[in-house]
Amino acid sequence: MRLDSKSVRDGNLYVFGGIGKNSEGLTQVFNDVHKYNPKTNSWVKLMSHAPMGMAGHVTFVHNGKAYVTGGVNQNIFNGYFEDLNEAGKDSTAIDKINAHYFDKKAEDYFFNKFLLSFDPSTQQWSYAGESPWYGTAGAAVVNKGDKTWLINGEAKPGLRTDAVFELDFTGDNLKWNKLAPVASPDGVAGGFAGISNDSLIFAGGAGFKGSRENYQNGKNYAHEGLKKSYSTDIHLWHNGKWDKSGELSQGRVYGVSLPWNNSLLIIGGETAGGKAVTDSVLISVKDNKVTVQN
């Protein structure tokens, strides 16, 4: 199984990187590219490698190219799982590894803040810019026209952000804007974003309540001892701010979100306790009123 980010372009489905097992059975981040052709029902691994590992990243399409940003640092992530493998069943060693892994400042994880572009016609990667702030992992992404929004995500393992970034491709130069925060103060990761009748939607996600305060008070292992909470909130962007405008029937995170019939379709995911869910949810907006169909 590969946890990854996908993009549809030229009638094909592209899978960029992801997390899986290597030939030795170790969990690791990949930087390869696979293409699926629905007409022939066939997969092919392309002779293309991103300049960095890709996991927890987001992907969107603009003007014929796929864009990738965010995600964990490949060396740090892979090193963590290599250390755990070396520790085996030694609980003392495992506790030490976890403490060292989580007890760092956000900037010391080197989450990807570069924007990369992938051209399907040449299968080449290019530098397309970088965030003036910081990289995130597990953000929600949605785009319309020349604008793309990156919503929340992890700022470091266990610590979310409530930030919302806007990428504006209007004109010749890409502009990065920071919008009003949402799901404050702790933020969530693995949420869902979409657009319905021109209304920007953000729903669900999971985080650790109190982690932001812990981090601001100098506790780098900010989520230590905290229980993961699963959000049911549905927020709408309206008049320059976010309004809580509805609720999901249960907290949900890490599923698939798609535009469908001018609505946001959420498929599967995870709910409280890490339990997998197999149903779907359709979120529609009309006159700033949210309708949820299960």
Where are these regions (language model features)?
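Kelch-like beta-propeller repeat domains
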Residues: 1-294
